[in-house]
């Protein structure tokens, strides 16, 4: 087991494969183990670093709120701890929010970026999803102890009794309003957006997000010379809750990360 002491946190990470680095950031209430079905594909030619975020998986919680900005600082510090100058970063849902804030606040440590099932504004979620996020409380956590999600958490958490605290902190984080549109428009790292065709994100917002990255604004020309540096993928037959295990996603990510750098 590997831990990095960063920002007062003992941050757990697991490494797989060798090659150019790729940091993986899981979704809410999960851990790096969520990527298990696609890890062999992602690590075939790369050094994959699967992280457990604050209070998740094998990373114990500390006395600070959950905030995208502080978790982004943890990831930037981890990249430095590992002796890396830069790394590709891929996140899903909560982890994609952290990845997005990492490239915004610490652009010097991010090479290419893959964001899966995440909005850049809070109203990018379907309204009922945004409302449900406000229901994460200690009491909700207690009720969730009968779920497979809790079983996976309790199996690896340093302090399983922190499950209720995690729910309270997640509820607070996910209730905060945010709009990162102006920051997104300034991102220069090649970025791939990936969504399910039955996602928790509004389809119109997916297109708006892509446009902020310079995508979908014009035809790419017959030779593709005017295509944007970023990519947008919508995976058929997937949802917000299973897209990260789709073999098609792993194949798309691998191709995106290996593609020649876009021209000026």
Each PLM stretch: what is its role?
Residues 9-60:
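Conserved HGGG/HGGXW glycine-rich cap/lid loop of the alpha/beta-hydrolase fold
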Residues 49-90:
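Active-site loop/oxyanion-hole signature of alpha/beta-hydrolase fold enzymes
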Residues 97-105, 110-150:
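Flexible "cap/lid" loop of the alpha/beta hydrolase fold
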Residues 167-183:
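Active-site nucleophile elbow and catalytic-triad environment of alpha/beta-hydrolase enzymes
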Residues 187, 193-195:
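Short beta-strand/loop motif that positions the catalytic acidic residue
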Residues 198-202, 240-241:
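Acidic catalytic loop of the alpha/beta-hydrolase fold
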Residues 200-208, 217:
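Conserved alpha/beta-hydrolase "acid-adjacent" motif
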Residues 220, 225-264:
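Catalytic active-site module of serine/aspartate enzymes centered on a nucleophile-bearing elbow/loop
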């Amino acid at each position: 087991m590997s831990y990095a002491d960063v920002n007062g946190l003992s941050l757990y990470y697991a490494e797989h494969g060798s090659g150019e680095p790729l940091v993986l950031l899981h979704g809410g209430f999960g851990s790096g183990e969520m990527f298990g079905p696609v890890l062999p594909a992602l690590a075939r030619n790369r050094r994959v670093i699967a992280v457990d975020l604050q209070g998740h998986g094998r990373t114990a919680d500390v006395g600070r709120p959950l905030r995208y900005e502080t978790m982004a600082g943890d990831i930037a510090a981890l990249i430095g701890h590992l002796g890396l100058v830069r790394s590709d970063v891929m996140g899903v849902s909560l982890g994609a929010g952290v990845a997005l804030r990492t490239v915004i606040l610490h652009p010097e440590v991010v090479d290419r970026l893959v964001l899966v099932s995440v909005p850049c504004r809070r109203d990018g979620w379907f309204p009922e999803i945004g409302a449900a996020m406000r229901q994460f409380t200690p009491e909700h956590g207690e009720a969730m102890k009968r779920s497979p999600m809790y079983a996976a958490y309790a199996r690896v958490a340093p302090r399983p009794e922190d499950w209720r605290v995690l729910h309270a902190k997640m509820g607070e984080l996910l209730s905060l309003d945010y709009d990162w549109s102006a920051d997104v428009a300034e991102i220069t790292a090649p970025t791939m957006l990936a969504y399910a065709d039955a996602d928790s994100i509004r389809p119109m917002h997916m297109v708006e997000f892509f446009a902020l990255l310079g995508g979908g604004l014009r035809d790419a020309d017959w030779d593709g010379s005017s295509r944007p540096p970023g990519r947008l993928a919508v995976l058929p037959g997937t949802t917000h809750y299973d897209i990260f295990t789709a073999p098609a996603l792993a194949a798309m990510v691998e191709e995106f990360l290996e593609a020649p750098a876009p021209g000026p």
